[in-house]
């Protein structure tokens, strides 16, 4: 399949925003959630699912179900290897530095590992223990493992029932489905990893984004795919919601209702709360409606395109960079000078771009082999 540069560039933009948000600099707060009450994580997961549906759905139609299933499992294994490597990096290099210089940011981030090293290592490799910052790849791996079955059902029987089940799981997650499943696992297996150490993301909420993206991507592989068309009133509503949320976020801050935690939960990121999804759908609608025209008029964004085309190694590298910065400089940017912020940002993106170029160069022989096989 021919790569679509605009999708790579958009994924590259998500990686840039995630890096800026995670790096402990003075830019992280003003540039966090820059488009409203939606973060780069939502866009990255949705776009990754869309690409998976587009690529692997097309593979299933052209080369068969087994080829698609094998490719999904190979991708899941690759992501698992990357997650395992970053996890071991955290448990060795970052732990050693953090303990040696008594860095609170590191000791707080991996407190469970520091008190229970062996159970943390085993449960981390089993995708149960998920330290902060390292909790999105385990969710991604689970989605990849489930996707072959989902795609087969969607291609053979349609997506209505699948999306209905997905919405149902999302709704149950708003009322604590993750905790119910955790409690059941504790009773059945004697699991000792505390609930708060199993990752901030609600898997049962975020699966809805993955399912939505997977369906949208797979639908483009039909011989005569119907374009996504929205009526004028829906576009106007999406524009109004997007503008209101954009102004609201930059006027009030990232907590939409200030200190009112009960109302802030309506925009909760970790459970993909209803108002957050409303904001995300508004931005999606605008991107689908105006994106093609914008892409036709704008120049190619080569740097973002390069980052997005090598999204997995770039994502892992930004984790390594952020962990190193936390270990040596801490989590409070006010404790170091502004010039260090600028130096960290420039050095970080230089490293990410270099990793992306290297990864793409190393992948060329494999890409050529796959293209020849197809």
Feature-to-residue mapping (PLM):
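Alpha-helical transmembrane segments and their immediate juxtamembrane cytosolic regions
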Residues: 1-374
């Amino acid at each position: 399949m021919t790569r679509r540069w605009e999708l790579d560039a958009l994924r590259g933009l998500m990686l840039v925003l995630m890096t800026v948000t995670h790096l402990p600099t003075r830019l992280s707060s003003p540039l966090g959630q820059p488009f409203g009450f939606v973060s780069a994580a939502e866009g990255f997961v949705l776009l990754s699912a869309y690409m998976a549906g587009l690529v692997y759905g097309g593979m299933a139609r052209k080369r068969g179900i087994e080829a698609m299933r094998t490719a999904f499992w190979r991708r899941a294994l690759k992501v698992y290897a990357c997650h395992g490597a970053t996890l071991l990096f955290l448990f060795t290099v970052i732990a050693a530095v953090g303990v040696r210089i008594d860095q609170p940011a590191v000791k707080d981030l991996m407190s469970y590992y520091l008190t229970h090293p062996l159970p943390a290592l085993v449960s981390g490799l089993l995708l149960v223990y998920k330290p902060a910052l390292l909790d999105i790849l385990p969710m991604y791996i689970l989605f990849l493992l489930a996707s072959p079955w989902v795609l087969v059902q969607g291609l053979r029987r349609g997506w209505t029932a699948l999306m209905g089940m997905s919405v149902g799981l999302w709704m149950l997650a708003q009322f604590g489905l993750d905790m119910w499943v955790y409690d059941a696992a504790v009773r059945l297996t004697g699991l000792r990893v505390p609930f708060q150490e199993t990752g901030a993301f609600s898997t049962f909420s975020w699966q809805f984004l993955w399912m939505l993206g997977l369906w949208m991507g797979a639908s483009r592989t039909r011989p005569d795919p119907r374009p996504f068309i929205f009526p004028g009133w829906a576009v106007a509503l999406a524009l109004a919601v997007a503008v209101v949320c954009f102004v609201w976020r930059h006027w009030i801050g990232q907590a939409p209702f200030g200190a009112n935690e009960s109302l802030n939960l309506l925009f909760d990121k970790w459970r993909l709360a209803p108002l957050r999804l409303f904001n995300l759908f508004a931005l999606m609608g605008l991107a689908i409606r105006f994106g093609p025209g914008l892409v036709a008029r704008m120049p190619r964004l080569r740097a973002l395109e390069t980052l997005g085309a090598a999204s997995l190694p770039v994502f892992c590298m930004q984790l390594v960079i952020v962990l190193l910065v936390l270990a040596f400089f801490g989590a409070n940017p006010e404790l170091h000078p502004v010039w260090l912020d600028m130096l960290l940002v420039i050095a970080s993106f230089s490293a990410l771009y270099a990793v992306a170029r290297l990864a793409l160069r190393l992948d060329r022989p494999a890409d050529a082999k796959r293209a020849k096989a197809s």
